[in-house]
């Protein structure tokens, strides 16, 4: 998602703030989608950033990309003076996982909730190890079955509960 739509008068794909693509901002957008129940839309943003990352050295996301339209079989246009890697961009994939899977934590209830989890198209399975809530820890498997995601707790220490909301 660009900082400004390509249809806006001030759009400039090489502008720092007027048409560029920021991984950090996209993770925040995905988080907002997830908060309002749009897990598949959050996963779609994840797909776009993953695709961009495949063209970056060691898949380390930079501060931003130029906002030129996507071109088949080509990576994004790198912003000439972007920090790469960039710390807040490095955190974006973790936030995107949380947003796509609808992960929530209730420490008082020792509960990890997974609300309508979705996997991006590039992932058919995902394993998260050592998710902590209070003093408890849980390993969880996520597997795509058609258009659904099956959630299976693998290992648990302590009294944490895993609740899936379909």
How should each PLM-predicted stretch be described?
Residues 34-38, 50, 54, 97, ...:
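Hydrophobic/aromatic-lined pockets within catalytic cores
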Residues 79-129:
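Catalytic cores of secreted or luminal carbohydrate-active enzymes
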